[in-house]
């Protein structure tokens, strides 16, 4: 969240001061930033080869220009995931965890079950 309470995504690389951070999710690679597909750039900064190249179950989070948060779980590689998030109207989007960690629950219904027990989850009300 920025200082005005708006959801935001920022790429800080290695240089970040945590003194003013109130909420933080570390994930990657970035998919979209300010409406631009940044997967190619993100792959250079995100060295986990399997995440950069393989197709599998993935989760992503994005924000539209109107501030709407989009959560998605799909079978895709990060290149395809960026295209999907762009098609859904996101201007900023980030790949989250994938594989057996991907799960999605909405409106009290299971949309995609996780393949294992999860230690950490994102919850929006």
For each of these PLM feature ranges, what is it?
Residues 1-125:
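Gly/Ser/Thr/Pro-rich low-complexity, intrinsically disordered segments
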